[in-house]
Design a protein with these regions (language model features):
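Active-site pocket-lining/capping segments in soluble small-molecule metabolic enzymes
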Residues: 1-145
C-alpha cells in the first residue's frame, strides 16, 4: 500500500505502466505509531477491547495491543477520501481500500451506507456526528507548505 502521507500531486507522478499493483487507503483510521511498550503496567488485567491515550489538547488516540504485545496507536480522526475517488482513478493507483477493523458492526454498516451513497452518487448518507473525518495530506502532501 502507498503511504497516505503522499498527496495527490505525488500520486500522479507514479508510472501508470508499473508491474507493481498500487493500493491507497481512502477510508479508515490511520495508524500513527507502533510501540514495543505494550502499556500492560497501565492497563493491568483490564481486558477491554479498546484503550485510549489522551494528549494535552484532549485529543484521544485509540490504542490496540497486537498479538506480539506491541501497542498500535491510531489517529483520533477518520481518513475520508471518498470525495476524491474520481481523481484517484486518474492516477496509477490500482486498488482503493477501506480499513474498518476498528469499527464495530453497527458503525461498519453506517460507514458502508455512507460510502455506497458517495460511490453510487445517491443522496449522501451522513456519518454519525461524533465521527470526525479529514483528508490527511491528500491536498498538499506531507512536506509541502
Amino acid at each position: 500500500a502507498i503511504s497516505t502521507e503522499l498527496g495527490f500531486d505525488d500520486l500522479v507522478s507514479f508510472d501508470v505502466n508499473s508491474d507493481c499493483e498500487l493500493e491507497y487507503m481512502i477510508f479508515g483510521k490511520l495508524r500513527l505509531m507502533i510501540s514495543e511498550d505494550n502499556f500492560k503496567d497501565i492497563i493491568g488485567e483490564n481486558k477491554d477491547e479498546f484503550y485510549y491515550l489522551k494528549d494535552t489538547k484532549n485529543n484521544t488516540y485509540q490504542l490496540r495491543i497486537d498479538a506480539h504485545n506491541h501497542s498500535q496507536i491510531y489517529d483520533e480522526k477518520t481518513l475520508d477520501l471518498t470525495n476524491h475517488i474520481e481523481k484517484l482513478e486518474k492516477t496509477a493507483i490500482d486498488n482503493l481500500s477501506l480499513d474498518l477493523r476498528l469499527y464495530n458492526t453497527t458503525q461498519t454498516r453506517e460507514i458502508m451506507k455512507y460510502i455506497d451513497s458517495k460511490v453510487n452518487k445517491k443522496q449522501v448518507y451522513k456519518l454519525p456526528e461524533d465521527m470526525k473525518t479529514y483528508t490527511a495530506n491528500f491536498k498538499k502532501g506531507l512536506y509541502k507548505k
